[in-house]
């Protein structure tokens, strides 16, 4: 069944910035998708096309991307008469229309919106759920489906919050839960106790939340953040059942080959900046002291040698985000140079569903894990909930249990788990090997 109408418009993300919403129409009805955006974006990501007109939306308008859907992509898809179940063919047509290596002509935000709509339309045509359709596209097992461990970003720093804290995300992971529903309850309880502790220790404003729903107290160090998180876990009685993850996002504080943990200070002293080896020592001290099971982006996006050296010294999950940008060329290099053992997959880093699935399978084939991720500028679209189940990734991060654009994904996973019943398992301690369960 081919597409009869394509329409895009400007809507708004969770930060109040414009983003692209796309609708396609087939004989089965209308299907919609909204594209997210990032704050700490990697320089190697596919291009999110913004207008750049400072007199409107402070330069963040997406009218060019919207116009590209309505005047270029839409007419070409309708003319092609490609069936909506031909996901690869449609995605390749859009890539060809763009004609650049990073989707800078039409915009990854334009292309991705259409790509996700097409998948929803195809699932409807086949009469199956979106996650089952994605599993078919990826040639992933469906017996049983795997429900992911949620990595809740409960404390925000870095580019996602004010305060002095350099590292961007401090996450909790209920690996000891027996189901996703129980993981949500455990995460909720720890989050609320953390909020109480933050207010007690740093004042009422410490309960204010960052872009991803985590508390954002004005704290200085990772130790301060981790001490408070571990205390909240222990208050709830979940010691050993709820673990911790960190996303350093250090590309924003990488300067002249060193890492400035005081980068938010206007007059940061270069003599205090850390060499890659010194930063590794710091990470090791945190790993010894706290129940950390996952480190994301321990080094900057082009500091390849530091990644490789560090991976040899740890036995926890090391996630590549800015390093790889869901880009198959960079993933291949990271695999070859043994830089990480897990891929962070963000749909809008690469710009089509087909390429995202290929990236996941590329990582799986190398023995890596895959974590599906939201963006800091999110929307109410829960597509990644179906994506993580369809790909059997075993782990997802979509912010804290706060802000509806974050909960939209988690609540959809609750529905999927309930719908599947005995036909699914919770990844739990096997979160890194979800595709092997």
From Swiss-Prot:
GO terms for molecular function: magnesium ion binding; phosphopyruvate hydratase activity. GO terms for cellular component: phosphopyruvate hydratase complex. The active site is at 212 (proton donor), 346 (proton acceptor). Pfam families: Enolase_C (PF00113), Enolase_N (PF03952). Keywords: Glycolysis, Lyase, Magnesium, Metal-binding. It catalyses: (2R)-2-phosphoglycerate = phosphoenolpyruvate + H2O. Mg(2+) binds at residues 247, 296, 321. Its cofactor is Mg(2+). Substrate binds at residues 160, 169, 296, 321, 373-376, 397. The keyword Membrane does not apply. Disulfide bonds: none annotated. One of its GO terms (biological process) is glycolytic process. This is Enolase-related protein 1.
